[in-house]
């Protein structure tokens, strides 16, 4: 995001890491790693957000990239650390390291290889952009010899430059409007896809006469 670079890049580059708080002081971690939840072969409203769903340049999660699901009972009872909430930052810890996205919506699960960072005393959108900026530093925590992996206990010690509250609030206000617009566009596109999928077979079968549709 150009706004982030324009507003903070110079200050971040000049900041002394000795005076910066650690990431772990600024977030609560939602961590359900350790074992795999019972999955369903059906597509439910409760997707597992894995590493594949965090790849790409977009800021928000595209749930079309989720391929695993749990049922309602598992969603409500299995996940010991809870579920992501809006504006949490989801980050991968195994495989393709430090892939990250912002969680928006109401249903989604994190289990193996992904944790959620919930900002408590910092703008979540500032923190997201900051983590994107230092992604190479996070990847450098890799301890895996066969499969790349990073420990959460390592990355939470990474220093984070925190600007004045007034600057954070000004950035958050603009960034949240832009991000909400992206999410609205995503939801509108999903609605149009569902409408297309519902109408196209009826058009092809002749059940609906295209000549009577006012387009």
Model-based region annotation:
Residues 140, 211-212:
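Short, hydrophobic secondary-structure boundary micro-motifs
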Residues 52-55, 94, 154, 164, ...:
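Short, small-residue-rich loop/turn micro-motifs
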Residues 24-41, 52-86:
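Sequence-specific dsDNA recognition surfaces
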Residues 50-51, 68-135, 139-146, 151-153:
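A short beta-sheet element
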Residues 1-38, 45, 161, 165-211:
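Non-catalytic DNA-recognition/assembly elements of restriction-modification systems
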């Amino acid at each position: 995001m150009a706004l982030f670079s324009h507003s903070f890049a110079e200050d971040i580059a000049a900041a002394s890491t000795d005076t910066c708080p650690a990431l772990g002081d600024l977030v609560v971690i939602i961590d359900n790693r350790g074992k795999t939840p019972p999955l369903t072969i059906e597509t439910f409203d409760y997707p597992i957000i894995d590493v594949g769903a965090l790849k790409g340049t977009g800021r928000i999660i595209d749930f079309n990239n989720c391929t695993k699901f749990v049922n309602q009972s598992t969603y409500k009872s299995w996940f010991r650390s809870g579920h992501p909430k809006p504006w949490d930052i989801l980050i991968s810890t195994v495989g393709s390291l430090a892939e990250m996205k912002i969680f928006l919506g109401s249903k989604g699960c994190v289990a193996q290889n992904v944790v959620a960072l919930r900002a408590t005393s910092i703008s979540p959108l500032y923190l997201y952009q900051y983590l994107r900026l230092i992604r190479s530093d996070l990847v450098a925590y890799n301890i895996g010899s066969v499969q790349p992996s990073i420990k959460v206990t390592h990355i939470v010690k990474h220093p984070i430059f925190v600007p004045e509250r007034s600057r954070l609030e000004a950035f958050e206000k603009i960034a949240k409007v832009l991000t909400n617009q992206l999410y609205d566009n995503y939801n509108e596109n999903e609605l149009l896809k569902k409408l297309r999928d519902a109408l196209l077979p009826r058009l092809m079968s002749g059940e609906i006469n295209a000549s009577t549709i006012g387009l």
